[in-house]
């Protein structure tokens, strides 16, 4: 079965009305995307910021084809749309289409990230088998790669790691495969907790990885059930990272290592200032430009606990 798509470009204050009207007309799903080139870097937990100009796309069954043009004009007038247009969408195997976008990634020092349905290109490498669809941290984003590259340069033998803001669990899993003794993963999102557990099982590291929501982690740490870390990884965003600085300082051993990511160039100075009472940080590492993407605006900070 083929499909019809109706696209509306409108201001963000009209998005709620546009969504309601599309649903009333029988839209099976609605997607939102940026109508321009406006980045949204800092969504905090519970926030859902929108771009100033938004393109809404409603998906309809093919039997709406004869009515969709008139529907488009009516809806455009109701929501003051800047633009309105329709497109046909051929039916396809969406699961296979989604899977086709993921390929194995080679990181530094013989570390690979491999989608769970694929065979590792190098069976002798350190291969992390991941489900890219569960939570943030698939290895395809520059911030994750920056942390992974840092981990491969560390001596992780017999080390205890705390991965704060674990997402998919990829950093903790990588640490264990690279020789760490124990990982404690933490995330505010229950879906990330589930994803981490599933990915840990997929990589046979469940015996050495525990995952918590923040409040449960804090209780276990206060009770002495979780030791201080040799290394802390935190790939989040600038605002929560700055707020976490004094807390993370309580979780780490003397001279322990830390790596922070999810940062852009303009945020580095404030981040160093937030952490300098406890950590000596190196600001020199940004993601290198590749043939496909320029992600050089993403940076990591790494250093040593001095408090």
Swiss-Prot record:
It comes from the Bacteria. Belongs to the methyltransferase superfamily. PrmA family. One of its GO terms (molecular function) is protein-lysine N-methyltransferase activity. It catalyses: L-lysyl-[protein] + 3 S-adenosyl-L-methionine = N(6),N(6),N(6)-trimethyl-L-lysyl-[protein] + 3 S-adenosyl-L-homocysteine + 3 H(+). GO terms for cellular component: cytosol. It comes from Psychrobacter sp. (strain PRwf-1). Methylates ribosomal protein L11. It is found in: Cytoplasm. This is Ribosomal protein L11 methyltransferase. The gene is prmA. SUPFAM superfamilies: S-adenosyl-L-methionine-dependent methyltransferases (SSF53335).
């Amino acid at each position: 079965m083929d499909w019809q798509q109706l696209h509306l470009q409108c201001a963000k204050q009209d998005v709620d009305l546009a969504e309601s009207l599309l649903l009333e007309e029988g839209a099976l799903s609605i997607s939102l995307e940026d109508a321009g080139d406006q980045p949204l870097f800092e969504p905090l937990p519970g926030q859902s910021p929108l771009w100033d100009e938004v393109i809404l796309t409603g998906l309809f069954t093919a039997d709406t084809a004869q009515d969709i043009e008139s529907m488009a004009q009516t809806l455009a007038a109701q929501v003051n749309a800047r633009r309105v247009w329709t497109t046909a969408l051929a039916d396809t195997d969406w699961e296979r289409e989604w899977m086709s976008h993921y390929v194995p990634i080679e990181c530094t020092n013989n570390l690979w990230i491999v989608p769970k349905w694929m065979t590792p290109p190098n069976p002798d490498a350190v291969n992390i088998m991941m489900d890219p669809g569960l939570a943030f941290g698939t290895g395809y984003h520059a911030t994750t790669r920056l942390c992974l590259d840092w981990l491969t340069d560390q001596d992780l033998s017999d080390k205890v790691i705390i991965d704060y803001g674990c997402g998919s669990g990829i950093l903790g899993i990588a640490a264990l495969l690279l020789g760490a003794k124990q990982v404690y993963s933490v995330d505010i999102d229950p879906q990330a907790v589930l994803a981490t557990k599933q990915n840990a099982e997929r990589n046979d590291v469940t015996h050495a990885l525990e995952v918590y929501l923040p409040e449960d982690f804090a209780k276990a740490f206060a009770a002495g059930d979780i030791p201080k870390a040799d290394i802390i990884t935190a790939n989040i965003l600038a605002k929560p990272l700055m707020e976490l600085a004094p807390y993370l300082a309580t979780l780490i051993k003397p001279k322990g290592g830390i790596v922070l990511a999810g940062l852009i160039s303009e945020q580095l100075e404030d981040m160093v200032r937030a952490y300098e009472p406890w950590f000596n940080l190196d600001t020199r590492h940004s993601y290198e430009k590749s043939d496909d993407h320029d992600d050089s605006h993403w940076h990591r900070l790494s250093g040593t606990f001095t408090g």
